[in-house]
Design a protein with these regions (language model features):
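Conserved catalytic motifs of the protein kinase core domain
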Residues: 9, 30-31, 125
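Structured adenosyl-cofactor binding patch, chiefly the S-adenosyl-L-methionine
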Residues: 12, 52-54, 68-70, 75-81, ...
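Short, charged, surface-exposed secondary-structure boundary motifs
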Residues: 1, 95-98, 158-163
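RNA substrate-binding interface of SAM-dependent RNA methyltransferases
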Residues: 13-113
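Active-site/ligand-binding-proximal alpha/beta "capping" segment
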Residues: 107-157, 161
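Alpha-helical structural signal
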Residues: 44, 126, 166-170
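Glycine/small-residue-rich loop that forms an oxyanion/phosphate-binding "nest" at active or ligand-binding sites
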Residues: 1-14
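Short secondary-structure boundary/capping segments
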Residues: 1-4, 22-26, 78, 98, ...
Length: 195
């Protein structure tokens, strides 16, 4: 019944809360994640947790990604898997089309040759498209993504794992949305004081 040595004394039976890609896209709000071939349950759980913490409304698991309800993924998500719209859609093309219909742009990370993530506007609704830990995004999926960014690094580190890079982008999106909202609020207060 459990895969841990000292489980909690609780048991439950529940149905999976999968939602169709179109419904997930509609629930995405300002931020969604599309995981393509992300196979490590720890990374996937980290991405679910970071997505929720940064205001994402949906995480779409596509093209061979780990089962979001795998025990290690659920634990790593700290329950976020139950609080965001989760889709096991299977097809990244369908997921991207649904997100585009819902008004979200698409953005992926690459190792080099793109602008730094902090130089790109992430305040508008965006879907972060994240690929396999070892191989990145498949070419057909990468070709459908509108923009790419890189995360500058120093030292000898070759790359970050997908959980870390996705988390950085989630919180950069949140930072930019907050900054935009604060500027808008400040502008509204100034307008209210004008005769």
């Amino acid at each position: 019944v459990t895969d841990t040595v000292t489980p909690q004394p609780v048991a439950a039976i529940a149905r999976f809360a999968d939602v169709p890609p179109g419904t997930a896209a509609a629930a995405a709000g300002p931020l969604a994640l599309v995981l393509v071939g992300v196979r490590d349950p720890g990374n996937a759980g980290t991405l679910l947790r970071s997505a929720e913490a940064a205001g994402a409304g949906a995480v779409l698991f596509c093209d061979g990604s780990v089962d979001p309800y795998a025990p290690k993924c659920v634990r790593a998500s700290a329950g976020s898997v139950f609080r965001v719209a989760v889709t096991r859609s299977g097809d990244a093309g369908e997921a991207l089309a649904c997100l585009a219909s819902a008004g979200l742009g698409t953005l992926a990370t690459v190792a080099r040759g793109a602008r730094s993530y902090d130089e790109v506007d992430l305040a508008d609704p965006v879907a972060l498209v994240l690929g396999n830990e070892a191989h990145g995004l498949p070419g057909d999926v990468a070709a459908r993504v509108e923009r790419a960014v890189t995360i500058p690094m120093v030292g000898r580190t070759e790359s970050l794992n997908v959980g870390m890079s996705g988390t950085i982008l989630c919180f950069e999106s949140l930072r930019q949305r907050r900054q935009r909202d604060q500027a808008s609020d400040q502008g509204n207060r100034l307008d209210a004081t004008q005769p």
